């Protein structure tokens, strides 16, 4: 391939038809930029609710974990003593009664030797609330425990009610209306 001597000569004035193409490229680039911005806006509108939902799932995981830990600690406490405890510090878990997302409570039941309820009450709109229960059930001469965690079906600051106690250790705990068992 041979080069002409004019290929590297930049001293020549541009041809008129070539300079008018610059405005076409600028206009096309601006249009593409607007189209790109429009597409990004649509993607953001789709992704933002998903992102916020993931953040809420993380916050709800805190409540599920804390309620589960409180139930396990109540089971251990009940093995050592003839009743459940009403005191969060007695469980020795290091769980604070209140976090940024939830308020945690141990709700005493009429017969502290048979059952206990723990709750995670949502403080933030969009989060579900939780109720956990431990039931002590006689099995011959021994006592065994059955646990359940109920999650509210909708986001609410009201934890589900206490589930009904199972008839025996093989029966499933039924969560109250408006909640589901985890």
Model-derived features: where do they sit?
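Low-complexity, intrinsically disordered extramembrane tails and loops of integral membrane proteins
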Residues: 1-24
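Selective for proline/serine-rich intrinsically disordered segments
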Residues: 12-14, 47, 161-164
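Residue-identity detector for glutamine
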Residues: 12-15, 54, 60, 65, ...
């Amino acid at each position: 391939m041979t080069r002409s001597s004019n290929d590297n000569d930049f001293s020549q004035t541009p041809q008129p038809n070539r300079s008018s193409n610059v405005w076409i490229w600028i206009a096309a680039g601006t249009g593409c930029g607007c189209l790109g911005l429009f597409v990004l806006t649509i993607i953001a509108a789709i992704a933002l609710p998903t992102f916020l939902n993931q953040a809420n799932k993380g916050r709800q995981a805190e409540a599920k974990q804390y309620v589960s830990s409180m139930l396990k600690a109540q089971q251990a406490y009940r093995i050592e003593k003839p009743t459940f405890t009403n005191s969060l510090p007695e469980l020795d878990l290091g769980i604070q009664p209140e976090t940024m997302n939830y308020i945690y409570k141990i709700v005493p039941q009429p017969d502290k030797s048979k059952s206990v309820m723990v709750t995670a009450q949502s403080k933030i709109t969009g989060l579900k609330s939780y109720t956990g229960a431990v039931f002590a059930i006689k099995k011959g001469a021994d006592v065994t425990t059955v646990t359940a965690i109920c999650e509210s079906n909708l986001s609410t600051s009201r934890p589900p009610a206490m589930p009904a106690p199972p008839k025996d250790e093989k029966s499933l705990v039924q969560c109250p209306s408006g909640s589901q068992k985890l």
